[in-house]
């Protein structure tokens, strides 16, 4: 507990500073520019929080799977993902839905093979991810606004050694980019040197971010490769960090056991 208190104090001292398939970061083609999205309030989602006893509270930081979720390279969102194949209203004995979507839709994890072919060939799929890294104490920090996560920014955050899981909240949350179906390539994320600084000078093994890519658009490939080539970093993208206070939490993220897949939708919660 003393260690967690120290981390929280350090955090307070730190400054606040044709369309691709969902999650397809394999190249950086010229993507369509969408019209400016209206400034609308985020729709209400069910199950955003609740008591778990003992004064603790569950915070759901997973975006609901909905047709309006953004996808890089599209102005129209991901579209309908769930289709009712059988309906009791039409005489079937049960209601039966079908789900079809990219494994990088909405809140999801990247496996090492996502952008490093040798790891894909070696079978380092989402089913090989370390659940121990996806569950445990995590630190939520605020990145200086209007800034990518560069090496300089990483150093300024003063994240203590020993912290293994960090969720980075950026201006993407302020701009409510995950609530807009239009792709917005002005999102911020890690630069290559920021990723290198994290790998070289911290003990962080889980990196969580608040938009579809851990890397900024300009650094899409190189920053991903820095993380994924190491095999030791787990990336969680498109987290819903609205209205969550900075500090220490217990993080629980569980991806699907998709054998052979380089990513998976994931349900992530924080317990305070």
UniProtKB/Swiss-Prot annotation:
Alphabetically, the GO molecular function entries are:
arylformamidase activity
Which Pfam families is this protein grouped with?
Cyclase (PF04199)
Q: Which residues form the signal peptide?
A: 1-17
Q: Name one GO biological process term.
A: L-tryptophan catabolic process to kynurenine
Q: What induces it?
A: Induced bycold, salt and drought stresses. Induced by abscisic acid, auxine, brassinosteroid, gibberellin, jasmonate, kinetin, reactive oxygen species and salicylate.
Q: Does Signal appear among the keywords?
A: yes
Q: Could you state one GO cellular component term attached to this entry?
A: extracellular region
Name where it mostly resides.
secreted
Signal: is it a keyword of this entry?
A: yes
Q: In which tissues is it expressed?
A: Highly expressed in leaf sheaths and flag leaves. Expressed in roots, stems, leaf collars, glumes, young panicles and pistils.
Question: Matching InterPro entries, A to Z?
Answer: KFase/CYL, KFase_sf
Q: What does this protein do?
A: May be involved in response to stresses.
Family of this protein: Belongs to the Cyclase 1 superfamily.
| PANTHER family named in the record | CYCLASE-LIKE PROTEIN 1, CYCLASE-LIKE PROTEIN 2
Q: What is this protein called?
A: Cyclase-like protein 2
Organism encoding this protein: Oryza sativa subsp. japonica (Rice)
Q: Name the gene behind this protein.
A: CYL2
């Amino acid at each position: 507990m003393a260690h967690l208190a120290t981390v929280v104090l350090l955090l307070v001292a730190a400054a606040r500073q044709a369309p691709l398939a969902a999650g397809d970061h394999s190249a950086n083609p010229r993507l369509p520019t969408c019209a400016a999205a209206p400034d609308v309030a985020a729709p209400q989602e069910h199950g955003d929080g609740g008591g778990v006893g003992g004064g603790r509270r569950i915070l759901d930081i997973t975006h609901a799977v909905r047709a309006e979720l953004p996808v890089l390279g599209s102005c129209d969102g991901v579209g309908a993902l769930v289709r009712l194949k059988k309906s009791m209203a039409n005489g079937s004995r049960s209601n039966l839905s079908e789900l079809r979507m990219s494994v990088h839709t909405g809140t999801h994890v990247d496996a090492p093979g996502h952008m490093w072919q040798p790891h894909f060939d070696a079978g380092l799929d989402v089913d090989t991810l370390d659940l121990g890294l996806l569950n445990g104490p995590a630190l939520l920090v605020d990145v200086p606004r209007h800034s990518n996560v560069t090496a300089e920014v990483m150093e300024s955050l003063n994240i203590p050694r020993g912290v293994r899981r960090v969720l980075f909240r950026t201006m993407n949350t302020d701009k409510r980019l995950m609530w807009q179906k239009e792709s917005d390539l002005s999102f911020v994320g890690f630069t290559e040197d920021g990723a290198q600084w994290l790998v070289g000078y911290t003990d962080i093994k889980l990196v969580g971010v608040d938009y579809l890519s851990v890397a900024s658009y300009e650094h899409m490939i190189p920053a991903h490769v820095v993380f994924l080539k190491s095999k030791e970093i787990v990336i969680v993208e498109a987290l819903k960090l609205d209205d969550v206070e900075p500090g220490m939490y217990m993080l629980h993220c569980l991806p699907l056991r998709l054998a052979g897949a380089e990513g998976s939708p994931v349900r992530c919660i924080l317990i305070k």
